[in-house]
């Protein structure tokens, strides 16, 4: 089994080091990750400036770009082979609910999925890397289980996994979940630069809004490892009928080519 590993915290982050060390015992692994922290970069690609790939002393390759850049470059020429699995993380903090829209960790895994490769995004629920070895061990266990069920290397799928910061033996079983929801982000933070200019920092993520049973928020709060299958299609299928009727009322029959 060949695995490509990336992340959004940067190639030196404890999460990706722990994940690499855990997975190298069961597979051929290669790391291609951002040079610096690229959190909240989602699926962004760098199109208007050159990207450079360098190799660290431990063999990790790092790119002056986004998480999606790293996976894209790896899969379109850098590796020279097609991996069986793309794994992203382990992220320093949760990627639950609305976080998945912004997450560079999820973005890296989604890039693998877009190239037709099964992909998993791993995150720890709390920041600070507490119990990171436990999280890496759980990630390895999940990958092994997927491989044993012949799911690795087959039709593409995308999973978002959040692991509580707990000792391995204290973690409760995997729980299949839907995404919860957060409240809107906190108010922007205003500061004054040394030159007297007003500058802004994006506020923190909002608290959980929908943390009902069945959500990733609920599962991890009760010690479970949450697993959520994701998809790329953003179509609002429930709203298609409503909007078809609404748009039909907005567009004159002649413009739509219909005969009155």
UniProtKB/Swiss-Prot annotation:
It comes from the Bacteria. One of its GO terms (cellular component) is cytoplasm. Keywords: Cytoplasm, Hydrolase, Metal-binding, Nucleotide-binding. Binds 1 divalent metal cation per subunit. It is found in: Cytoplasm. It is an enzyme of class 3 (hydrolase). Pfam families: SurE (PF01975). Its EC number is 3.1.3.5. It catalyses: a ribonucleoside 5'-phosphate + H2O = a ribonucleoside + phosphate. Its cofactor is a divalent metal cation. Disulfide bonds: none annotated. A divalent metal cation binds at residues 8-9, 39, 91. One of its GO terms (molecular function) is nucleotide binding. Nucleotidase that shows phosphatase activity on nucleoside 5'-monophosphates. Belongs to the SurE nucleotidase family. This is 5'-nucleotidase SurE. The gene is surE.
């Amino acid at each position: 089994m060949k695995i490509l590993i990336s992340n959004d915290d940067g190639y030196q982050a404890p999460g990706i080091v722990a994940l690499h060390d855990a997975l190298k015992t069961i597979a051929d692994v290669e790391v291609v990750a951002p040079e610096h922290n690229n959190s909240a970069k989602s699926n962004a690609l760098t199109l208007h400036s050159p990207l450079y790939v360098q190799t660290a002393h431990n063999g990790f390759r790092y790119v002056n770009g986004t998480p999606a850049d790293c996976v894209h470059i790896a899969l379109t020429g850098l590796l020279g082979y097609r991996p069986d699995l793309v794994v992203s993380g382990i992220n320093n903090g949760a990627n639950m609910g609305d976080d998945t829209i912004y997450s560079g960790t999820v973005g890296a895994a989604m890039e693998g999925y877009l190239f037709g490769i099964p992909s998993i995004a791993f995150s720890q629920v709390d920041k600070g890397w507490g119990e990171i070895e436990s999280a890496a061990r759980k990630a390895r266990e999940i990958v092994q289980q997927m491989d044993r069920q012949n799911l690795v290397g087959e039709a593409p799928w995308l999973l978002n996994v959040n692991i509580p910061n707990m000792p391995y033996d204290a973690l409760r079983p995997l729980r299949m979940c839907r995404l919860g929801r957060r409240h809107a982000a906190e108010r922007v933070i205003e500061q004054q630069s040394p030159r007297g200019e007003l500058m802004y920092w994006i506020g923190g993520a909002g608290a959980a809004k929908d943390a009902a049973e069945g959500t990733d928020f609920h599962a991890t709060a009760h010690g479970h490892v949450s697993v959520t299958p994701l998809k790329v299609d953003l179509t609002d299928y429930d709203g298609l009928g409503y909007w078809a009727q609404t748009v039909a009322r907005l567009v004159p029959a002649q413009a739509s080519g219909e005969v009155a």
